[in-house]
Amino acid sequence: MDSSTLIKRLETAKSSFQNLELQLADPDVASDPKQLETIARERSRLEPLVNDYLKLQIIEKECLEAKGLVKESRDDKEMELLAREELQNLELSKNELIQKLTLALLPKDPRDERSVMLEIRAGAGGNEACLWAGDLARMYERYGQKLGWNVKPISSTEADMGGFREMIISVKGESVYSQLKFEAGVHRVQRVPSTESQGRVHTSTATVAVMPEADPVEVKIESTDLEISTARSGGAGGQNVNKVETAIDLFHKPSGIRVFCTQERSQMQNRERAMEILRAKLLELELAEANAKERSARLSQVGTGDRSEKIRTYNYKDNRTTDHRLGVNFPLEQVLSGQLEDVIGACIAEEQKRQMEELSNQSED
């Protein structure tokens, strides 16, 4: 982004911020709690950006003063040296602030602040794939716990030999989607299964879908499009297990999506949870369609977000995790223990780099 485009966008943000301040002082706005909350939230979002812009203006003024001092001190070498050192420090602070402001102005995904549902499905590899799906679930659980997120399995189908055929995990917290969206795709593992007597390395896969939670208003579901039946639950039902039909089997006819929910203790809770999962799945379908259209206009990006894209290989023999989108290796044990900060951070940095290149190309056009 060139400097003129940056300043123009910062001035627009500053004007918007000042306008919001005026609205907050309006008695009519103060008497409308909903409008007041919306305006206050937008003001809070813009405040750090505007404050940094004001800092930039101050530093630019100080840079001009320092340059003037350098010229005035040419006859005093010691003073000139001090002035040049001060100018160098100011220029460094200025460039760091410009970089920060540029990143802050990059397009934001409106869903980044949302909680998500992770759907992990065993792929190729039979029993070993089911075990691998369980390993991935534990990896995300550890990562979420480190960040203080609330991670809870809400639907699962266990495999006969251990692990899971599929599992849906609710991950609630601040800006969850902004990080976990880079985990969508096929995760491939290369290792020797515990049942392998010859010591041969097997390759198995599991698929991860990352679904931002959908608001009921955002995804409209007609009751006539649903087929709902109940079943006896084998979940956390205590004495009610196999006596009361608490499980919900929900089928959405237009999309063909089926959700079977057994984790909650009551039929009503399972129904609410099943509807929550269905809304997230339907929103994912909409996003996939929108992303496909957007990708056709892009030259590159950090992954497609598609659940069929192979994004990572976990090689046990070499103790290596390879992210194929980045072409970078990470320590296997570190990643599986839930230390995903470096991997996800690298994906975010690469995405920001791509966005900055797009903005630069747009400004040149």
From Swiss-Prot:
InterPro entries: PCRF, Pep_chain_release_fac_I, Pep_chain_release_fac_I_sf, Prokaryotic/Mito_RF, RF-1
PTM sites of type N5-methylglutamine: Q239
Superkingdom, taxonomy of origin: Bacteria
Disulfide-linked positions: none
A molecular function GO annotation: translation release factor activity, codon specific
Post-translational modification: Methylated by PrmC. Methylation increases the termination efficiency of RF1.
Location within or outside the cell: Cytoplasm
Pfam families reported in the protein's UniProt record: PCRF, RF-1
Coiled coil feature spans: none
One GO cellular component term: cytoplasm
Keywords: Cytoplasm, Methylation, Protein biosynthesis
Similarity comment text for this entry: Belongs to the prokaryotic/mitochondrial release factor family.
Role this protein plays: Peptide chain release factor 1 directs the termination of translation in response to the peptide chain termination codons UAG and UAA.
NCBIfam families: prfA, PRK00591.1
Official protein name in the record: Peptide chain release factor 1
Organism: Prochlorococcus marinus (strain NATL2A)
